[in-house]
């Protein structure tokens, strides 16, 4: 049974969610019985191996359905091996991407049927959804420009996609925002990092209170 708190972070490329996640850690240590951070795809050995296959820049021939099914397989392994045990122990789990990425990227971005993706998500997660999703919204061109300037970020296959795909991905996220505004909360990611972190922390504290 789920006793902990699951918070996912979502956004288009270059939104800075990974940096925000790291900056939030000192403020969230006292929620639940502990705190873990993890990512999709990845988080455990099998899922990290799948991640390498998905993001390898040379895998340009990958079919959209193949890509989706690899993400779903990674998701299931990650959940059963790491996320669900942590939640059962009452921990706060911060996830860099989760189910909404599949809807935005493979649904809106690749043009696959969103209902099919939602069914696969349901199948892989047994219906688990985040208690809160922070969606970091940024203009697509600004986000991609950030990536181009970053010396530490390795280029992956999705970075090589055209602007049109990334625009569709953002529209997918905004569609989720319209559909699930209670769970899916927008943060303006074009602001300085410290302001984005402060806004994110305020949303978390409003939803779950201050840690005891």
UniProtKB/Swiss-Prot annotation:
Keyword Ribosomal protein: no
Pfam hit, one: Thymidylate_kin
Encoding gene per record: tmk
Positions annotated to bind ATP: 11-18
Gene3D superfamilies linked to this entry: P-loop containing nucleotide triphosphate hydrolases
Reactions performed catalytically: dTMP + ATP = dTDP + ADP
UniProt protein name: Thymidylate kinase
Keyword Translocase among UniProt keywords: no
PROSITE patterns given in the database record: THYMIDYLATE_KINASE
Family stated for the protein in its record: Belongs to the thymidylate kinase family.
Molecular function via GO: ATP binding; dTMP kinase activity
Described purpose of this protein according to its UniProt entry: Phosphorylation of dTMP to form dTDP in both de novo and salvage pathways of dTTP synthesis.
GO biological processes: dTDP biosynthetic process; dTTP biosynthetic process; dUDP biosynthetic process
Record-listed E.C. numbers: 2.7.4.9
Entry keywords, A to Z: ATP-binding, Kinase, Nucleotide biosynthesis, Nucleotide-binding, Transferase
Native source organism of the sequence: Streptococcus sanguinis (strain SK36)
Source superkingdom: Bacteria
A GO term from the CC aspect: cytosol
